[in-house]
Amino acid sequence: PWYVFDKDIDKNELFVCQGINNELLLSKRLECENVSWINNIDHSFPKNCSVQVRHQHTPIDCKISIKDKIFNVEFSEPIRGVASGQSAVFYDKNICLGGGIISKSA
């Protein structure tokens, strides 16, 4: 089967690859916008925490930095299934810190 691994909305293009284990389906980082923080926790950056990008995924360790109002999230290891438009939710152990909308993955 074929899987979508990227899209260019401006050009109306989808990029596909073959096979569920294709390395193109893995992401090492993402960019997040419209981030909202909850709880009265220190939100200074860079910040080490964990992120969950899909309902069934286990949160994975990450490092968050910020540049020009874009939150850059680097994973401790590549993960599958990151797509723009999805939510990214950040945790410190079992405490939810907040979340945002994924604008780009790589």
Tell what function each PLM region has.
Residues P1:
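Hydrophobic, well-structured mid-protein blocks that either form specific transmembrane helices
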Residues K7-L97, I102-A106:
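Basic, glycine-rich polyanion-binding accessory segments appended to enzymes
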